[in-house]
A protein has these predicted regions:
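PLP-dependent class I/II
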Residues: 2-4, 9-14, 19-34, 39-56, ...
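Short gly/ser-rich anion-binding loops that grip negatively charged ligand groups
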Residues: 39, 59-66
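Generic short alpha-helical segment signal, independent of protein family or function
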Residues: 54-61, 81
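Conserved N-terminal alpha-helix of the aminotransferase class I/II PLP-enzyme fold
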Residues: 63-96
Length: 400
């Protein structure tokens, strides 16, 4: 009998997508499913991006430069300068989504068996890409009771071993929505300098900060050789399907190394770069309007969640995600039950089980991630559905 690889056996299922067959079956049965499980915004992709592609139809769809079109990278330099990130276009490698940026960063900076420290809960695909790269994720737990702030720095330092080569931070955070402040990032800078570590900084949601402003890890001059910035246009411009991201670093050795991986996959998507370059010409008020819409959705979601008996959800400071604690026995069972065995007014709701965002077994059992990417009317309807579901769920666990 043929066997699969050990690596394939270790690859985790996506907590965000693994319930998709159940949702599809629910829809075939006539239910409306409110998708709060995945960060796919319903806000329209800017028309200028689509028009740019239409206006650049070529009889031959060519490879681009392996690092990405120079014109796009040069315009990105101006974009980053607006965020107090001072770089040259040669400090940028365009990738096929932030996913490839994460994988290339792991492959270029860490060896098999090396360790990367990540506060949990964390974006589930970090673990998947660590498996692909043969590295080990070391988690440090944050808590819903304090809003998922950065774990105590001494707890992070206690996890450092001779195999530790990096710390990874997502700011604002997916899945919690927590916005790390400058003082928290300074503590991480101190650690990476003290122990000579890389700091992978996933900043894909920097435009969406509601409680304070975004501070980039790239603004630490002393640690500039240590910081690898991971970026994406997916959520910024509601263009997830374009699959375009970036790696940004002033460390030339890292750029030269990652460039070899970029050359091996030939080039990032041709038309995605044309669309993304056009997006950089959008007026500044594009983000003012978009941010205000997400903030309004956040406010509705958090108010509705915390109004449900025995539900608690801290107020996220950024991105468009929230982690909530529910009075349930098992989030995986509950999320499946919502799609298989429950409906309210011919609707149900799809959530992402919290366990999939933790590396520590048993953590997140009563938590779910919700993405507030639907309009407020749909969020209200989804919360009506969730409130009714919690009244009748067989595995409800009430506080004593």
């Amino acid at each position: 009998m043929l066997k699969i690889s050990n690596r394939g056996g270790l690859m985790p299922e996506s907590p965000i997508r693994k319930l998709a067959p159940l949702a599809e079956e629910a829809k075939r049965n006539g239910l409306t499913v409110y998708h709060l499980n995945i960060g796919q915004p319903d806000i329209a992709t800017p028309p200028a991006m689509i028009e740019a592609v239409k206006n650049n139809i070529s009889p031959i769809i060519e490879y681009s430069h392996s690092a990405g079109n120079e014109s796009y990278r040069r315009k990105l330099v101006t974009y980053y300068a607006k965020h107090s990130i001072d770089i040259k276009y040669s400090d940028i490698i365009i990738t096929t989504g932030a996913s490839e940026a994460i994988l290339f960063s792991f492959l270029g900076c860490l060896d098999v068996g090396d360790e990367v420290i990540i506060p949990e809960p964390f974006y589930a695909n970090y673990y998947a890409f660590a498996v692909l790269a043969g590295i080990k994720v070391i988690t440090v737990s944050s808590s819903i009771t304090d809003g998922f702030c950065l774990p105590a720095i001494e707890n992070i330092e206690a996890k450092i071993t001779p195999r530790t080569k990096a710390i990874l931070i997502c700011n604002p955070n997916n899945p919690t929505g927590y916005l790390y402040g400058k003082e928290e990032l300074i503590q991480l800078e101190t650690l990476v300098l003290k122990y000579n570590l890389y700091l992978f900084a996933d900043e894909a949601y920097r435009e969406f900060c509601y409680e304070g402003s975004h501070f980039s890890a790239f603004q630490f001059e002393e640690a500039s050789q240590h910081v690898i910035l991971i970026d994406s246009i997916s959520k910024r411009y509601s263009a997830c399907g374009l699959r375009l991201g970036a790696i940004v670093t002033k460390n030339k050795l890292v750029i030269d190394t990652i460039m070899k991986f970029a050359q091996a996959r030939l080039s990032p998507p041709y038309y995605a770069q044309i669309a993304a370059e056009a997006a950089l010409d959008l007026p500044d008020d594009y983000f003012v309007i978009t941010k205000a819409e997400y903030q309004n959705r956040r406010n509705v979601l958090i108010q509705r969640l915390n109004a449900i008996p025995e539900v608690y959800c801290p107020n996220p400071g950024g991105a468009f995600y929230a982690m909530a604690k529910l009075p349930i026995d098992d989030c995986d069972k509950f999320c499946s039950w919502l799609l298989k065995d429950f409906s309210y007014k011919n609707t149900t709701v799809m959530l992402a089980p919290g366990t999939g965002f933790y590396g520590t077994p048993g953590m997140g059992l009563q938590e779910v991630r919700l993405a507030y990417i639907l309009n407020t009317e749909s969020i209200h309807a989804a919360m009506d559905c969730l409130a009714e579901a919690l009244k009748v769920y067989p595995g409800r666990v009430s506080k004593k």
